Structures are given as C-alpha cells and as structure tokens.
Amino acid sequence: MIQKKVTDFFALEGNYPDLDGEGAAARLSAAIRCKTINYFDHSRTDYTEFDKLHAHIKASYPNIMRVGTFERIGHHAVLITIPGSDASLRPCLYMSHQDVVPVVEGTEQDWTHPAFSGDIADGYIWGRGTLDIKEQVFGVLEAAEYLLAHGKSFARTAYLAFGDDEETINLGALAIAEHLKAQGVTLEFVLDEGGCKIEPGTAFGAPETAISSVQLMEKGYADLEFSVHSIGGHSSRPFGGTSLARLSGAIADITRAPFSVHLNSAMTGAFETLAPYITEEPLKTLVQDVAGNADAIAACCMGSPDLFPFVTTPLSLIHISEPTSHAQISY
C-alpha cells in the first residue's frame, strides 16, 4: 500500500499573524479592474488604464513610496528602487509585467466572472491577470510593504521592475535594462515570471509528491515568416501548383526536421533533486544515475506532453494568411 503524503502548505502562516490577507486580496482585485491590455499595435492600447494602475500602486503602498523611488521608464514600464544599506552588495531585481492579453471576442460569456471584474468569490480572485501575472506584481509589492511597515530595512538594494508590453514586444523590459545599464548597475540575481503552481509531480514520475517548479532558465525564441510567390490566376487553372501548396510543403519539411534532444543542467538538477521521490518506472531506475542516463531520461521527457519542451525546441505554426477570394490563386 502506498501511503499518500500530505503537505501542510499553510504551516508558516502563523509567522505573519498580522498579515492583512483581505486587504491584499482587495488590492489585487482593484488591479484586475484596470484593463491594462497591450496590443502589438500600440495605437490601440489604452494607456489611461496603465495610469490608473500606477496611481493604485502609489496609493496602496505608502511605505514603499516613502523609502523608494517610482519611475516610469519608456512608455509605461515601472521601475521602483528600494535602496539598500550596504553599498558593497550587488542589487537584486524582481520582475513581472502589468499588461494582459485581450479577451477573445465572442468568448466573454464563457467566463465564470467577467474578465475584468476582479470579483472575490468562492475563495478566489477572478479575472484576467490573476495568474498572468498581476498576482506576482502585487505579491512582490505586498511583501516589500509588509517588511518596511514592520521596521525592516533592505541590506541589498531591490529593484521592482514591471514591464508594460511583455505580451507583445517587450520594449518596456528593454527600456528598463538599458536604464540600469546606463547607471552601471550589476545585479546579484533576477527573479522573473515562472511557474506558480503547486501540483503532483506526476510528469516527473513522482505522483505522490507535491512539487513547485522553480524556473532557472529562459529559452530563447525566434519568429519565422515564410513568403511564397507563384504565377497566380484563377483556381481552375493552378498551373505549376499554388503558393499555398508550396508553402505547406515547406512547413511540412520544417516540422518533420527534428531538433536536438538533450537534458540541460536545469533539468539534470531537477531530476537529481526529485530522485528520492520518483516512484514510477522507467524514471525510478534511470534517475539513480542522472548523468549516465541523461539520453534515456531525455527520451522519456520527449514522450511527455508536459516535459518535452524542456528537452528540445518546439515549433508552432500559428498563422497562414488567406486569399481574398476562393476563386483566386494568391501570387
């Protein structure tokens, strides 16, 4: 019989007896009501909603505003600097982003609560941004405010950096990076958006163990655009094939070409850490020697819908433009 492990995720709550949980929820709820949607075409973005969010932050965290500086960088990115007492220590950077993606038109009725209601109901805060990722923006702010309100000071300078267009082109993050570089800032570490769930380690072969992934790396990416030109004309006379057929063939060739598969250092560390808790084969045996069985472990990951992106480079086809008429062959 396997005895299910039970973890008390609230064991340390007693360490903060005066933590204003209801107030923290209300402040996040108010932030959700700020419709900070950013579009690739920034002319469509309503920056007054970002102004509302900035005003809300300034009003909600008086101790941060008292000891720190609030700067708007670039268009509407935010950099809050909380100075440390020890100049010999390199500063740290806590990152997140203010912007959210729009609600897909026609799906508004599918939301249990309206996307920008910020409703607090059934033990949850509801709305766009509660998981991606205003909860991290306000989690960092709540933590810093709590420490400062209780007379604590920072030995190491802390930067709180909140981009305004992470969901589109990341100009806000770039502006913050350039601003810090111009000041000659060298960071000790960066804490950015990552996994925020506590869940069974089933994907790792440890279904009886609750895990929360700490993301140590960020993969790069590339956007590729393919254009094909052909003779064109009427669809009843597709001499030589159509542009779409040629493009489809190229896409098929690319998606069939495998990228390399390997276990990087972060995944190696993850399996080494989880090894005592992995109960399912073949991983249970393989993780007894993670380095020696790296290729076999990576192959197992390739068979998992949860783990395969961590051992190879995924490729996603997301858009094909369409002709203006069903009878027309695109050039």
Feature locations, PLM:
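Acidic/His- and Gly-rich active-site-bordering loop/insert found
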Residues: M1-T130, V137, L147-F154
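Acidic-enriched catalytic cores of C-N bond-cleaving enzymes acting on peptides and small amides
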Residues: V6-D8, L180-Q183, E188, C196-T209, ...
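Predominant activation on well-ordered alpha-helical scaffold segments within soluble catalytic domains
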Residues: S29, F138-L141, E145, L174-A177, ...
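Active-site-proximal beta-strand/loop segments in catalytic clefts of secreted hydrolases
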Residues: I32, I82-P83, S96-Q98, F162-D164, ...
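A generic structural motif
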Residues: N38, L131, S230-S236
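Acidic/histidine-rich catalytic neighborhood of metal-dependent amide-processing enzymes
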Residues: Y124-G127, L131-S213
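Residue-level detector of conserved catalytic or cofactor/ligand-binding positions
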Residues: S316-Y331
